[in-house]
């Protein structure tokens, strides 16, 4: 018995989950992991435009939060979230990407940010003294895109994300 989902057929066979897009395998870019550019039409740009169109069609008018998740590290959630965010920003949507993979942060790589960038873990570790909005970084890719990176890997990631302050303060940045 096979326990690994390897392709679209596996997803369709064992789930009722709708597939919004199927991304082709791509070479890693030299700098960062953003593979789409404004006004280009290669296969990745078109694939992310298709994902964006399907996502917007699927979401309700007032739905403004999209969660990207996976079962294991290295499956591409930061890559897909980052490129989808850029695609939405190029459409004129205001977007903030919030890095919550605080065990193995990757947004710094995706957006070519400093590995020392402060982020949500700084805030969650000391919410009384750290301003959440000071952790947000403006993207040089689009004026419509901001990033709240994960921050340094904490010794207690589970406890940090379980804090009530997280839910309350993420509602402040809800666009």
Enumerate the predicted regions with their spans.
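Short boundary/hinge segments that flank catalytic cores
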Residues: 1-94, 100-121, 125-129, 133, ...
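Short, conserved active-site loop motifs that form the nucleotide-linked donor/cofactor pocket
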Residues: 145
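ATP-hydrolysis module of ASCE/P-loop NTPase motor domains
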Residues: 148
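Flexible phosphate-sensing "switch/lid" loops adjacent to ATP/NTP-binding sites
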Residues: 151
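Charged helix-capping and loop-helix junction motifs
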Residues: 162-167
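Substrate-engagement module of ASCE P-loop NTPases
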Residues: 170
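Conserved small/polar residues in nucleotide/adenosyl-binding loops
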Residues: 173-175
């Amino acid at each position: 018995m096979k326990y690994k989902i390897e392709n679209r057929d596996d997803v369709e066979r064992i789930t009722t989950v709708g597939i919004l897009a199927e991304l082709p395998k791509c070479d890693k870019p030299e700098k960062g992991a953003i593979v789409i550019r404004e006004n280009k039409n290669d296969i990745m740009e078109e694939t992310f435009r298709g994902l964006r169109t399907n996502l917007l069609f699927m979401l309700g008018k007032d739905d403004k939060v999209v969660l990207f998740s996976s079962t294991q590290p290295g499956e591409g959630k930061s890559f897909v979230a980052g490129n989808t965010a850029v695609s939405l920003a190029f459409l004129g949507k205001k977007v903030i990407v919030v890095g919550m993979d605080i065990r193995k942060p990757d947004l710094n790589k995706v957006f070519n940010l400093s590995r020392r960038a402060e982020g949500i873990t700084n805030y969650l570790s000391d919410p009384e003294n750290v301003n959440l909005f000071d952790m947000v970084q403006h993207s040089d890719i689009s004026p419509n895109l901001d990033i709240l990176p994960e921050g340094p890997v904490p010794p207690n990631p589970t406890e940090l994300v379980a804090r009530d302050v997280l839910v309350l303060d993420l509602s402040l940045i809800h666009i």
